[in-house]
């Protein structure tokens, strides 16, 4: 479903601020993989997601999504294959529009140049059923402005919008990092439910090692623009945070320096 072949990306090359962000990165995701991505600050996690999304072009290498070479495609054209949720709950929704209007935008994205006038009764019932699954009471607030929602409600709505058209690949860039622990747990529960229900191939960046172990069927750890650990299946299920830290230290020869990753 996703192939990253020998990907390189350097920012500010030839200057005092030169930074090698991706350094010969290779990764293959099978259809239905739910991969959690961890690593210290500057490891290349977000750069990898941005490279896949086309936010910036890679210097070398090849990116293939569902058998299609998208390496040279613009971010706009790649959006047809992708769903994405960012860290900031304010990103991904239109604050001044109603919940149902936001869902209508997501549903019609890429299908027509102009929005249809109004929302049909059939669409409204469909949105109610979709929102009911979230368990947040939003199905009774279809006309409420999204700007009035809590951060958790808004992020759950963004997640629903990002997956409405069943994307080939779902990218989650620390999408619970700005939420309180209780709300983050709820959004992760919703994430797991949607990903499993729709069999979505997913990459989820997190700084929380326990979340990385709890969710998904596969875990990768990055360092200096490369993948240094790739754990899946039964091996992943048996891991503890301590085991994971030990494996990191063995693979890298360093201690893991990001204390926030130890939170559970």
Spans of model-derived segments:
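A short, flexible loop at the N-terminus of ABC-type nucleotide-binding domains that lies
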Residues: 1, 10-24, 74
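ABC ATPase NBD coupling module
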Residues: 15, 57, 69-83, 91, ...
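The feature captures the beta-strand-to-loop junction immediately N-terminal to the Walker
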Residues: 38-40
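Helix-to-loop junction immediately C-terminal to a conserved catalytic motif
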Residues: 53
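Conserved ABC transporter NBD signature motif
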Residues: 61-68, 229-231
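ABC ATPase C-loop
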Residues: 162-163
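H-loop/switch region of ABC-family ATPase nucleotide-binding domains
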Residues: 206-207
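Conserved beta-strand-loop-alpha-helix hinge in the C-terminal portion
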Residues: 226-252
């Amino acid at each position: 479903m996703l192939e990253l072949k020998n990907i390189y990306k350097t920012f500010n090359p030839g200057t005092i601020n030169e930074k090698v962000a991706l350094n010969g990165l290779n990764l293959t995701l099978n259809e239905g993989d739910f991969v959690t991505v961890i690593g210290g600050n500057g490891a290349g996690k977000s750069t990898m997601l941005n490279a896949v999304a086309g936010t910036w072009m890679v210097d070398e290498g090849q990116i293939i999504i569902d058998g299609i070479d998208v390496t040279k495609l613009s971010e706009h054209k790649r959006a047809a294959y992708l769903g994405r949720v960012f860290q900031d709950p304010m990103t991904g929704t239109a604050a001044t529009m109603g919940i149902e209007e936001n869902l209508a935008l997501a549903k019609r994205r890429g299908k027509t140049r102009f929005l249809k006038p109004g929302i049909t009764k059939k669409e409204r019932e469909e949105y109610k059923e979709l929102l009911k699954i979230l368990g947040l009471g939003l199905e009774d607030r279809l006309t409420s402005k999204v700007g009035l929602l809590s951060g958790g409600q808004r992020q759950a709505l963004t997640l629903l919008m990002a997956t409405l058209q069943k994307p080939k690949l779902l990218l989650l860039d620390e999408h619970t990092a700005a939420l309180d622990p209780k709300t983050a747990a709820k959004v992760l529960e919703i994430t797991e439910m949607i990903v499993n229900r729709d069999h979505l191939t997913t990459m989820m960046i997190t700084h929380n090692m326990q979340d990385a172990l709890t969710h998904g069927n596969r875990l990768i750890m990055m360092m200096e623009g490369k993948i240094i650990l790739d754990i899946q299946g039964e091996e992943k299920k048996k891991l503890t945070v301590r085991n994971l830290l030990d494996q990191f230290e063995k693979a890298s020869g360093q201690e893991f320096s990001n204390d926030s990753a130890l939170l559970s």
